[in-house]
Structures are given as C-alpha cells and as structure tokens.
Amino acid sequence: EYIAFSDQDDIWLPEKMLSALKLLKKNDADLYCSNLTKWDTSNGSFSELKKDFPQKEFDYLFEGGSAGCTYVFTKKIAKELQSFLVKLDTSNWKGFSHDWLVYFFARSRNFKVFIDGNSFIHYRLHQENVHGHLNKLSWNTIKEKSSEVLKGYYQNHVMNYIQYLDKDSAEYKIYKSFLGNYFQRNFIIWKYNTQLMRDNRKFMIFAVLNLLKF
C-alpha cells in the first residue's frame, strides 16, 4: 500500500516507516518527507538537517520537499507518478533531482504533502554526497549555490518542468517570466519572494545570486 525511497548508505531508525505511515493517515496526505540527521563520516558527528519549514504556495517550483531517502508515499500517487515517469525524458537535464521531481509532481497535482519535523534517518555525508553538504549555511554552500545559479541549473529544470503545467496557471506564468530576460526573471523572483522557497535564508541567497546572473 505504500512505497519508500531508500539510499543504500543511509541508516533508518527502527520507527521510521511506522511513524511515516501514521502521519500519512493522520494528515490524510499522499507524500511524507522529513528532517534528517546528518552523519558526517569524516569526523563521526551528527547534526540536524531541517526541512520542515512551512510549505509555501509556490515552493515546489524551485525546490524539493526533502532528501528523497525520507520520502514515503501512497499507492495512489505512486501509480500516477509511474505513468508520468514513463513519458519523462531526462536526457537534457543538468543534475537531475528526483527529490525535486517527486515533490513537484505531488504539489502540482494537488496531492497533500506532509513534512515531518522529526528525523528517523542518519543521512550519511561523504565526498560523493554533494547535496547533503549544501544545506548548511557556509562559504562552501554559497560557492556551490553560486555555481548552480550562474551555470543555469534552475533554468534547465524550469525549462523541463514548465511543459507539465497549465498555461493559464500562476505557476506557468512564474516559470515563463523566470525563463525571460534578466529583468523579467528578477522581477518575478522579488514579486513572489519567500513564496518561492520555504527557508527564507535559502531564498535570499537564491535571489541575490540571480541579481548577479546576467
């Protein structure tokens, strides 16, 4: 009745699935995701990776719900997602993110998503695990985010996602402006501002970097 993503190098706590299923039922949701506990194998330290900022109206247009390894979803959304994926061409996507894709799919089709403030997974960080390192506000984070913005990571994803939106929707118009010229892109970012990302600090970095991208 339920499907969960799993990364082979992470550790699930015993209550992970039971807690996810309880919260899916309690909140009448179709997709569950959660905070994570970062496990830095270089020094053995643990720290929280917060993802449960309040959901915003358009956050799914520019980010995922959490790391995909926290996702648990119902058979209903799984069947629709399967049909969607069969037709999906990712050959021209740069740094394709299944975390973002599933969240985009769920929210754009009005499935309810619940983001749990608890963590039931030890999310292993290592050299190959790029995204895990990018959630801490640091100089390395800013450098990596700068590279994403300046090299067109977001434009590339938006160009692919826009084709799955209703052309009369506000979401489509946001994407259309984002793909426009410098002034159109930055106008739409500042018009909707923190409605585009859940974490206000993350949004500010995103917005400022777009001002620097000509």
Tell me what each language-model feature is.
Residues 1-136:
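Nucleotide-sugar donor-binding/catalytic module of glycosyltransferases
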Residues 90-91, 108, 122-214:
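C-terminal subregions of glycosyltransferases and related glycan-biosynthesis enzymes
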